[in-house]
A protein has these predicted regions:
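Accessory interaction regions appended to the cores of large information-processing enzymes
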Residues: 1-184
C-alpha cells in the first residue's frame, strides 16, 4: 500500500460547458491541497500574469473571497471595457457563488475549504451580451465542473465511445472525417 504524504495528493480536475451562444460558460477547474501541486500552480499563476490575462481571487463581495480560495483565470483577454466588466462582474460573481454552492452541497468538504486551493479557467465570450445569463451559466458551470472532478468524470467508456463523433459548440467535423474507424 502506498501512502501519499499530506498535500501531495493528486489534484481533482473538472470541466463543464453550460449554455449556448455568446453567453455560454466553459470552465476548467483544478482543486488540490495548498501545500501540493495545485497550491504551487495557484501561487505561480497569481504571481506571473501575462498581458491580457491577470488572474485574481474570486470574491463573493469586496474583501470576502470565496473558500476554498479560488483563482479566476481568464481564457480570453478583455476585448473592450464591456467585455472586461462581464469578466469582473457577472462571471466572477457566478464563479464565487458556484464554489460556495459546491461547499454548501458537500462536494467540497468544509475542512477542504480552508486547506485547498481552486484554479478556475473561465471563458467569457467577447461578444457576450447578457450579464444575468453569464452569471447563471458560470455559477452552474463551476459547481458542475467541481462535481465532475470529484467524481473523476468523464467515464473512460464515454470518452472512447465519443471518439468517432467529436463535436463542440464551435465545430463538428463532417461524418466522413469524424469517424476514422481506426481501432487503436
Amino acid at each position: 500500500m502506498r501512502i501519499i504524504p499530506a498535500g501531495l495528493e493528486v489534484p481533482q480536475i473538472g470541466e463543464c460547458f453550460v449554455g449556448s451562444g455568446v453567453n455560454a460558460a466553459h470552465i476548467n477547474t483544478v482543486l488540490g491541497h495548498r501545500s501540493g501541486p495545485a497550491g504551487v500552480a495557484w501561487a505561480t499563476a497569481l504571481a506571473t500574469p501575462s498581458e491580457g490575462h491577470v488572474p485574481f481571487v474570486a470574491v463573493l463581495r469586496p474583501s470576502l473571497p470565496v473558500k476554498p480560495l479560488t483563482l479566476f483565470v481568464t481564457k480570453s483577454a478583455p476585448a473592450d471595457d464591456s467585455h472586461g466588466l462581464l469578466i469582473w462582474g457577472p462571471a466572477q460573481a457566478g464563479v464565487a457563488a458556484g464554489v460556495a454552492d459546491a461547499v454548501a452541497a458537500g462536494t467540497i468538504s468544509v475542512d477542504a475549504a480552508d486547506t485547498h486551493a481552486l484554479i478556475a479557467a473561465v471563458w467569457v465570450n467577447p461578444k457576450a451580451d447578457d450579464a444575468d445569463e453569464v452569471y447563471r451559466n458560470n455559477r452552474q458551470a463551476i459547481c458542475t465542473a467541481i462535481a465532475n472532478g470529484a467524481a473523476k468524470m468523464p467515464d473512460l467508456h464515454d470518452v472512447l465511445s465519443a471518439r468517432h463523433s467529436p463535436s463542440n459548440p464551435f465545430y463538428t467535423p463532417p461524418a466522413d472525417n469524424a469517424d476514422s474507424r481506426q481501432e487503436n
